[in-house]
Amino acid sequence: GSALTVRHADTKYKPVSLPPGVIRFQMKRRTMTPILENEAASLFVLNGFAEGVNDLRLVEFHSKANALTDASMEIVAAVSEDHGSGIIIHNDAQHFSAGVDLNAFRNYIERKDWNGIDAFLRRFQDAVCKLKYTPVPVIGAPSGLAAGGGFEVLAHCDKLVVHTNSVMGLVESAVGVVPSGGGIKETYLRWFNETHSWE
């Protein structure tokens, strides 16, 4: 891809420069090789990006619209086991994740494979719960849309560093589905802990 440029007052386009200490993963990714990868997500080791920060793991979703599938959640579950000194879940795509792949759900429904739906949801819930209880810091760094399952992955992170263009939420009811990846529980727990912290 071409470098990001901005037009200056002298009508010349110049490359956008990043402030000191700011790193765009998209630029670094070109020279990195994932330690684990499938058709929907990749797992990278980050070393030397900041002073004293080494052995971080970064998960990047890269399916169509970053829709979450079994393959995506395999990488999320894997990073919970091989977590290094910390985990970052991020990508520089237009959308962090448009949620769970509804085409996969439609296929389950068309086949009347209700056990398949239950098994998928169990795997999704297991992966995000492993992420939540990983003994290292887990940082979610979304940009763009983080809907449904994408939001539910982020809800299980310890901290979020959210881009100003981010739109997040549980949108399942718009398509007639109840959110089932733990996002309702995590949203409630955060709200409860914040509103009752004074007691």
Feature names for model-found ranges:
Residues I117, Q125, C129-E199:
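Conserved catalytic cores of soluble enzyme domains
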Residues G1-V53:
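NAD(P)-dependent Rossmann-like dehydrogenase/reductase catalytic/cofactor-binding core
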Residues L56-F61, M73-N115, R122-A141, H163-V167:
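A structural preference for short, pocket-lining loop segments at secondary-structure junctions
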Residues F49-D55, E194-W198:
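Intrinsically disordered, low-complexity coil segments
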Residues G1-K12, H90-H95, G140-F151, D158-K159:
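A glycine-rich phosphate-binding loop feature that marks nucleotide/adenosyl-phosphate handling sites
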